[in-house]
Swiss-Prot record:
Protein name: D-aminoacyl-tRNA deacylase
Cofactor(s) essential for the protein: Zn(2+)
Function: D-aminoacyl-tRNA deacylase with broad substrate specificity. By recycling D-aminoacyl-tRNA to D-amino acids and free tRNA molecules, this enzyme counteracts the toxicity associated with the formation of D-aminoacyl-tRNA entities in vivo.
Organism: Desulfurococcus amylolyticus (strain DSM 18924 / JCM 16383 / VKM B-2413 / 1221n) (Desulfurococcus kamchatkensis)
Family recorded in the similarity comment: Belongs to the DtdA deacylase family.
UniProt lineage: Archaea, Thermoproteota, Thermoprotei, Desulfurococcales, Desulfurococcaceae
EC number: 3.1.1.96
Length: 272
């Protein structure tokens, strides 16, 4: 059972949810914890009052769900128009945006990869070429769930969040995923380096059957350690078999640690 979840206070998430309701006609029913609640074929759709970064309660409120997809807005100071996918977690620091310090959520590499590819398909189908399709590096909460969770987002301002075409792009992406529109398999990996929008990692995932779990952007490399790398590989529904590193922006000390780590763990290592 897939749980599609959103905040009723978020115009992007609620707009995507409304599109899915219009398209799939799920049965509206009640849930004591949800403001809006629907049941469909193989999925539930639930809207909550809380902001999505504080959705650590999902397992208590939706115990029947095996995997969560969060429908959400994305904010960017640069104003980048985007459709993005990412996993959750805090590599270090104070966890100012939900979750716990030093904790990563459970990644679902194949789900995130399928959503990324479908986003590109529907971005092109709706001629939204001004929108970037991208992974984001792992960030923010929730982090404490024992089931996998993936965010899919519209960026990056109120006009984009309210736009009905954007709701259709992301809504059709989610519907395509629910219907099994892409059945391809992929090689699970983790990513190191690159910016918050790790373009080289995204380009690789769109060109090859490699699907990313956690991605650590270059701004988070100060937190990289064996312990953190263990979390990146273990907090996933499937064990990664390769570590892919954007070489530019990583220092020799990072590369040395990674080379020792992959040798010890019998993982492949690739620089891009």
């Amino acid at each position: 059972m897939i749980g599609l979840v959103y905040s009723v206070e978020d115009p992007a998430g609620r707009g995507i949810a409304s599109y899915i309701v219009e398209a799939l006609k799920p049965h509206r029913t009640t849930n004591p914890y949800a403001m809006e609640y629907y049941e469909g074929d193989g999925f539930v759709l639930a809207g909550f009052n809380e902001d999505v970064i504080y959705f650590d309660f999902l397992e208590e409120r939706l115990p029947m769900v095996s995997e969560y997809i969060v429908l959400s807005r994305h904010s960017s100071k640069a104003g980048v128009k985007s459709y993005t996918v990412h996993h959750t977690g805090n590599y270090g620091g104070e966890a100012l945006s939900g979750g716990r310090p030093g904790e990563l959520g459970i990644a679902s590499p194949r789900t995130a990869w399928l959503l990324l590819r479908l986003l590109k398909t529907y971005r092109d189908a709706y001629s939204r070429n001004e929108y970037e399709v991208s992974y984001e590096a792992t960030h923010h909460g929730p982090t404490s769930l024992s089931k996998p969770l993936v965010f899919i987002e519209i960026g990056s301002g109120l006009d984009e969040w309210r736009n009905r075409v954007n709701h259709a792009v992301v809504g059709d992406t989610v519907i395509g995923f629910l219907r099994g529109g892409i059945r391809d398999e992929c090689i699970p990996v983790i990513g190191i380096g690159g910016g918050h929008y790790p373009r080289k990692h995204t380009e690789l995932a769109l060109a090859e059957p490699v699907c990313y779990g956690h991605i650590m952007a270059k701004y988070a490399l100060e937190y990289m350690s064996r312990v953190v790398l263990d979390k990146m590989t273990e907090r996933s529904v499937v064990k990664p078999v390769e570590v892919i590193v954007e070489k530019k922006g990583t220092r020799q000390e990072h590369r040395s640690l990674l080379e020792e780590y992959v040798s010890e763990k019998k993982l492949s290592l690739r620089y891009i």
